[in-house]
Amino acid sequence: MVTQRHIPAAQADPEDLLKRSGLPTFFAVNQPETLPLVRPARGPGQHVRVWARSLSGMQKECIVASALGTIWRLASDEGPYLDGFDAAPCPLAFMTVGMVSSYMNSLLAVANARELAIRHLTLVQDNRYTMEGSALQGTMTGGALPVGLEVQIGIDVGDDVVADLVQTAVCVSPLERLLRERHASRFSLTVDGREVPVGRVETLDSCAPPDPQRAFSQFALPVTTGVPISRLAAVTPVAGVAGGAHTSLQSKQRRTLHVRALCRRRHDGVKEIEQQLHSPLGSTFQFLSDEAPGQGGLGAAPDAASYMAAGVAFCFMTQLGRYATILKRELPKYGVAQDTCYSRGDASSAEDTSGTTGAVKTHVYLDTPEGAEFARDCVDMGEQTCFLHALYRTPLETMISITRV
């Protein structure tokens, strides 16, 4: 049983820092060499490093860097279900957008390798997650359900050829082994500037880099033009209904979450993705995604791997903040430095060259007067309730449907 403690009344109410900053929600970082942060090393696959910090309420921002592409600053918020300001997409949006973009990349690569001309292509992806148990008793657990992928395709070949095209594309995507295998996440923990042992989670045996909180505060971010991300439909806060206002802060829960994305490719090659949050009740956003030069794109927007990596970091951090809020404990600042790796299989090979994904490695930084034991509980419960760490640790299958158009 976890003991609750009331937060002192003097603690400031959350404020919409993303709106107040005046910065674009997403933007490419200009002059990345000025950042006091170490970029991921080049190697097999696409290594992605995320530095993220909490802002106010459920708002977070991150700098995400791939060894192959541009450095991006991304931001996330939550809707009325977590008493957020709804100023930016929710964490789960980033993973769904990255996944559907990755599937689109793989499908186009396989079609190109086989010299198949596609007239029309739209992907519709559905991600569902579960949350059950009590936060106060330490039994609340996040889960991930099989991914649904509908391929709407116009192409002048037979059904067998289309089916093989889609199956091969799914196989060579980095998501193939992310979903089919169990990946155990590893963590380190720094509390108030001092590294301490973790609790139940697996230990990350590597030196923790500098606290992202300090790194963010050391420079004013130089930016290029912000990548357009627009809200297509704003949610209306509703109380007393499933998925409505404040419902995700209840201490006992049994619910299913549903995120959908529709992905199309523009004439310039950039992918345009409409992300919908059906449960809990959330807003609809439009994302853009593009791969790096030399990887099939021009780097005009964040790539698939960057979105997926940012989603994991943002979702885990939401669980840290949510857990502290439910328990009424003080957690004024928190951040992560996270490493992930994704590798796409060979689209032109007749051999089995499945895409691969590495485990998530996360250095966690907490500033709290509650002590190291509470900090360890936060990390344990953060991993236990994080939907996207559940996605990594749960073997799943992609449920594919094909619609000829």
Q: How would you describe each model-predicted region?
A:
Residues 99-103, 315-316:
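Alpha-helical metal-binding/catalytic segments enriched in His/Glu/Asp
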Residues 104-109, 318:
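Metal-dependent nuclease catalytic cores in nucleic-acid-processing enzymes
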